[in-house]
């Protein structure tokens, strides 16, 4: 049941409509949808840009041992953005014939698996993995990858095992100590600031009371959805690794939606004027 709730929450965070969620910053009250509608109805200047957010490249995860929820399975990547490969993918699941028992499957059997670039649909680098029994996608975060929920578990009939790669793959929770927790706390402050700024800029650009209401409602749900997902991350309360990574993912998502709504003038700036050459003497 907990896995099902977490999957639903992850789906909300990753696949929300353009009117998306915002993190409620510490010390601030949850946004009032009615107030959001009033502000959206008031004519305001369109912001020139949302807060700057530089999504990480594949170097942030290549060569690092990653575990699902910081405790289960194993994922290791190699190569670059144009030739990314999965060197190791181990999934922990349940025995099909006896769901009360756990099973472990080594996907690929040690043979590197190609991960093809799928662009940046939600602001982060996305890669697609075409495994016959278990196709999935993942987004690249800082020291982690985030795989969205699947419609159904991957079935490995010969191994009598079913498993899912969905969730946050990151550093082992047991390896994150006090020093790492302090760095994570600083990263969270930056991520929350970017998220708040991107939400505000998107609200202004929407310029529609109904959409502003939807965005405000999604905002108020984000914090609880994130908590549901990160509850299963190993030692999350001691370091907050999952919390900051999902906050960064949401900030990137809002930035992508903001950019999609850019006025035509911003998307297609006029060509630069050529300087006239002085007449030759």
Question: Residues of each region from the PLM?
Answer:
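Intrinsically disordered, low-complexity segments enriched in polar/charged small residues
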Residues: 7-8, 19, 255
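N-terminal alpha-helical modules
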Residues: 22-281
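Sec-dependent N-terminal signal peptides
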Residues: 4-13
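Domain-scale selection of a single, long terminal region
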Residues: 1-2, 22
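N-terminal signal peptide c-region/cleavage motif recognized by signal peptidases
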Residues: 14-18
């Amino acid at each position: 049941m907990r896995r099902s709730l977490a999957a639903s929450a992850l789906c909300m965070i990753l696949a929300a409509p353009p009117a998306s969620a915002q993190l409620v910053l510490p010390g601030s009250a949850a946004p009032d949808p009615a107030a959001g509608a009033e502000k959206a109805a008031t004519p305001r200047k369109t912001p020139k840009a949302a807060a700057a957010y530089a999504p990480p490249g594949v170097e942030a995860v290549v060569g690092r041992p990653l575990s699902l929820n910081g405790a289960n399975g194993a994922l290791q990547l190699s190569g670059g953005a144009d030739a990314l490969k999965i060197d190791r993918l181990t999934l922990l699941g349940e025995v099909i014939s006896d769901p009360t028992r756990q099973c472990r499957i080594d996907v690929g059997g040690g043979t590197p698996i190609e991960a093809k670039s799928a662009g940046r649909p939600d602001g982060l680098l996305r890669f697609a993995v075409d495994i016959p029994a278990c196709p999935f996608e993942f987004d690249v975060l800082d020291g982690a990858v985030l795989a969205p929920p699947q419609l159904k578990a991957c079935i490995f009939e010969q191994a009598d095992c079913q498993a899912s790669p969905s969730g946050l793959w990151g550093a082992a929770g047991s390896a994150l100590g006090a020093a790492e927790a302090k760095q994570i706390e600083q990263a969270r402050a930056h991520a929350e600031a970017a998220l708040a700024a991107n939400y505000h800029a998107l609200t202004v650009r929407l310029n529609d009371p109904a959409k502003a209401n939807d965005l405000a409602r999604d905002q108020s749900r984000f914090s609880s959805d994130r908590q549901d997902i990160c509850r299963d991350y190993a030692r999350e309360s001691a370091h907050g690794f999952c919390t900051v990574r999902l906050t960064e993912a949401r900030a990137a998502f809002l930035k992508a939606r903001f950019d999609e709504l850019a006025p035509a003038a911003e998307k297609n700036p006029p060509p630069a004027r050529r300087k006239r050459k002085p007449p030759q003497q």
